[in-house]
UniProtKB/Swiss-Prot annotation:
Pfam families: PD40 (PF07676), TolB_N (PF04052). Part of the Tol-Pal system, which plays a role in outer membrane invagination during cell division and is important for maintaining outer membrane integrity. It comes from the Bacteria. Its main location: periplasm. Residues 1-24 form the signal peptide. InterPro entries: 6-blade_b-propeller_TolB-like, PD40, Tol-Pal_TolB, TolB_N. The gene is tolB. HAMAP family: TolB. GO terms for biological process: cell division; protein import. It is found in: Periplasm. This is Tol-Pal system protein TolB. Belongs to the TolB family. The Tol-Pal system is composed of five core proteins: the inner membrane proteins TolA, TolQ and TolR, the periplasmic protein TolB and the outer membrane protein Pal. They form a network linking the inner and outer membranes and the peptidoglycan layer.
Length: 435
């Protein structure tokens, strides 16, 4: 893999990746959690139907989700003092004595042909009361999603922050077949399960980005030996080329309302930022300079764009109002700052910070101007916020330079590694909320 930041790579239209093995689900490993994480017990869910229970282990999925967040320390099943499936059987004193603050119990109840109700309750053992309880209808193919929905509810009830377990991640993988590389744009659940291929190509795929409604992806494809921007439904039903101008077509970014797209074009000379009206394909030129301007990112109100520019000599991040005026420089820490992505509330800017030959993920608070490095890798790039703003997924160079995905919390306290059993993955993009 070529050790250069994403901005330079994309502008040179290079995309060098090592050959991969077979595609598989991403395995998520917790490498650092919050000190003093919340003690919680997810009691194995009961099965109230005849015969064998469905294969999905609802309780295990919820436990894995909460553990993966880094905010919770789930009790091992072998240490649980009791295994109730009904609220009246929960002994608060016993659980408090075991050092558990919250208990989740539940059951899977048949509700007709291939229909089930995932019923669960969350209890606060300190206060000795039920916090919440839900019944989620699902078919057998939807049980894993129901477990993610339950995880979101539990997470929000305890932390006050909406959970992001029932979301998806898009990424690019590469395989080698018959001595040639094969590129694939894939979408998986946020926990790495259920990977699906959206598009395959013999040529590189770059910069996938989700539409605000979570139904489409925009990305850059080189299938016609030139960079072009496409929009595709995630179910594969429709695919449309929206930018194929002479020169560079790169870095698509949906507006918050989904009606416009910011992109980088070199049709008029140097790479500049443009905004396309997706209804009539009309273009508004946002920047016009002799520098390289790229990697646009919308503010949540749709009024401003952040972008990367080398107009000061080295790549730095700027903010430009769409109503006009001069761009304002935002970053001053390090020789390189690029690939800006905003938290959903618009307060934090995640970016790639380069200094001393290393590229790491950092965040800048737009209100306080506080700058913080979050990662310590050699080549970390392509940050993307979870829709609740709690985590940032990014690409990194793993052992031997192999490309992996990783995630870090916005405060740097929680770290995860997302690894294919064989191969390499790049270009992550976290979906918006899907419900």
């Amino acid at each position: 893999m070529i050790p250069m930041p994403k901005m330079i790579r994309s502008l040179l239209l290079l995309f060098c990746l090592l050959p991969l093995g077979a595609q598989a689900a991403l395995e998520i490993r917790i490498t650092q959690g919050v000190e003093g994480a919340m003690p919680i017990a997810i009691v194995p869910f009961g099965w109230e139907g005849p015969g064998a229970r469905p294969p999905e282990d609802i309780g295990a999925i919820i436990q894995a989700n909460l553990h993966r967040s880094g905010q919770f320390s789930p009790m091992e099943q072998g240490r649980m003092p009791q295994r109730p499936t009904r609220g009246q059987d929960v002994n608060f004193q016993v659980w408090r004595g075991a050092g558990v603050d919250y208990v989740v119990i539940g059951r899977l109840v048949p509700a007709g042909a291939d229909r089930f109700n995932v019923q669960f309750q969350l209890f606060d053992t300190v206060r000795g009361r039920q916090v919440t309880g839900y019944s989620i209808p699902a078919s057998s193919s939807q049980l894993r999603r129901a477990a993610h929905m339950a995880s979101d509810i539990i997470y929000q009830q305890i932390t006050g922050v909406r959970g992001a377990f029932n979301t998806r991640v898009a990424y690019v993988s590469v395989t080698r077949e018959g001595g040639e590389q094969r590129f694939a744009l894939q979408v998986a659940d946020a926990d790495g399960h259920n990977p699906r291929t959206i598009f395959r190509s013999r040529q590189p795929i770059l910069s996938p980005v989700w539409s605000p409604d979570g139904r489409r992806l925009a990305y850059v494809s080189f299938e016609n030996r030139n960079s072009e921007i496409y929009v595709q439904d995630i179910d594969g039903a429709q695919r449309e080329r929206i930018a194929s101008f002479q020169g560079i077509n790169s870095a698509p970014a949906w507006s918050p309302d989904g009606r416009r797209m910011a992109l980088t074009l070199s049709r008029d000379g140097q790479p500049d930022i443009y905004v396309m009206n997706l209804a009539d394909r009309s273009l508004l030129r946002v920047t016009n300079s002799r520098s390289i301007d790229t990697e646009p990112e919308w503010t949540p109100d749709g009024r401003n764009l952040l972008f990367t520019s080398d107009r000061a000599g080295n790549p730095q991040i700027y903010e430009q109002s769409l109503s006009g005026g001069q761009p304002r420089r935002l970053t001053f820490d390090g020789r390189y700052n690029g690939n800006p992505t905003l938290s959903p509330d618009g307060r934090l800017v995640a970016m790639v910070n380069g200094d001393g030959g290393r590229f790491r993920i950092a965040v800048l608070d737009r209100q306080t101007r506080q700058f913080r490095l979050l990662t310590d890798g050699r080549l970390d790039e392509a940050p993307s916020f979870a829709p609740n703003g709690s985590m940032i997924i990014y690409a990194t160079a793993g052992r031997g330079g192999q490309g992996e995905l990783a995630a870090v919390s916005a405060d740097g306290r929680v770290r995860q590694s997302l690894v294919l059993q064989e191969g390499e993955v790049r270009e992550p993009a976290w979906s918006p909320f899907l419900d």
